[in-house]
Amino acid sequence: GDWIKNSRDGLTICDATSAAFAMDIDWSKLDVGTFSWQKSLGGEAGHGMIIFSPRAVDRIKTYSPNWPIPKLFQLKKNNEINLDIFSGSTINTPSMICVEDFLDVLNWTKEIGGLEELIRRSKDNLNTIKDWVLSSNWVDFLCEDHKNLSNTSICLKLIDHKLITKSQQTKNMI
């Protein structure tokens, strides 16, 4: 549905870490979006991206909080928006191996058909797990309403009474 209105006040902020590269995201509805490289694309953990809409940039320009902001999160310099971070300057120096890994996976993504193919593969993976769960008599989805199943955060539960009563150590091995 259209639950994020175009004529809204305030900013819409989305942590898209699980959804980026695996689900359709209407980026036009978001003012701030974040994701980590490794969640859906693999690679090195600990690196993230932040995307600002023009509305978010305007908010940064016009709002100064009354509390101190850690240097890593300061988006202003000398009371002006710090445009350096939008033109290639990094806030914190990432490993160049990690950057190269990310560029390599983006090139691979392009070769296999782009974002549409990544989303298709993610949905196919969920369908494979659905088929397996349906054929199983010892496991089910934790999410009981299958309309709410996610192709990026799959949680399963044991349903076989013999398995449920096993020790935690045994369950961990399953």
Describe the role of every protein-language-model region.
Residues 1-21, 32, 40:
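Active-site phosphate-binding strand-loop segment of PLP-dependent enzymes
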Residues 6-8, 27-28, 135-136:
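Short, well-ordered coil/turn elements that cap or connect secondary structure elements
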Residues 9-12, 31-34, 48-49, 130, ...:
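Structural motif
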Residues 19, 125, 148-149:
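Short, catalytically relevant binding-site loops at active-site mouths
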Residues 22-40, 45-48:
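Internal gly/pro-rich beta-alpha loop/helix module
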Residues 38-127:
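Active-site C-terminal subdomain of aminotransferase-like
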Residues 127-134:
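Active-site rim loops that border cofactor/substrate pockets in soluble metabolic enzymes
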Residues 134, 138-174:
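Conserved C-terminal alpha-helix-loop-beta "cap" of PLP-dependent enzymes
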